[in-house]
């Protein structure tokens, strides 16, 4: 089952979503990523259900003067529980996004994750990470140019931790907009 609620005003927003997905759930189309868990030590996939709680609260500041059109501050929590109600994953995020009156934007985001790996996991051909609790955080900043123009661009940089290591990421993109018929975007991302 899944149930949710949403409340929005000009300045304030709130979202809550609750879900319970059993290991025997199969979608009619696509797939549910979290059900299939890969055990790198046994080289097999194990189906595990989950319970999910997502909340987001946001607040908008709408200046009447100056170059800023809107400042949005938001906080998100996504908590995943195992079928026995033990914690599987908890992701918290704080975001500040500034939309300028010229349709460009600037954003800052801070993410904190707590992940309890149920099974040894490998992201590379190296030694699998052991099944245990990991806590890691990332910080990112991004800018997007005026979206109304024929050509636009965006870039984002983030850095922090990832499981037992560090991560640095840079992404950039260009956009060609010929409304109402065409909107073409080319993105590139580098992760280290």
Q: Language-model segments: which ranges?
A:
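Exposed, low-structure sequence patches enriched in small/polar residues
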Residues: 1-192
């Amino acid at each position: 089952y899944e149930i949710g609620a949403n409340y929005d005003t000009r300045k304030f927003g709130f979202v809550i979503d609750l879900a319970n997905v059993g290991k025997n759930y199969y979608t009619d189309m696509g797939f549910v990523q979290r059900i299939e868990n890969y055990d790198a030590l046994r080289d097999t996939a194990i189906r595990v259900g989950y319970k999910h709680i997502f909340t987001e609260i946001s607040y908008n500041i709408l200046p009447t003067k100056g170059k800023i059109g809107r400042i949005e501050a938001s906080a998100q929590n996504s908590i995943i529980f195992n079928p026995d109600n033990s914690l599987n994953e908890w992701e918290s995020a704080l975001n500040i996004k500034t939309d300028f009156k010229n349709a460009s934007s600037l954003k800052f985001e801070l993410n904190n994750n707590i992940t309890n790996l149920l099974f040894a996991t490998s992201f590379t051909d190296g030694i699998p990470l052991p099944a245990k609790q990991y806590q890691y955080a990332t910080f990112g900043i991004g800018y997007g140019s005026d979206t109304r123009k024929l050509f636009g661009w965006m870039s984002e940089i983030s850095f922090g931790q990832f499981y037992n290591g560090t991560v640095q990421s840079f992404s950039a993109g260009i956009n060609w907009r010929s409304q109402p018929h065409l909107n073409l975007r080319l993105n590139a991302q580098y992760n280290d």
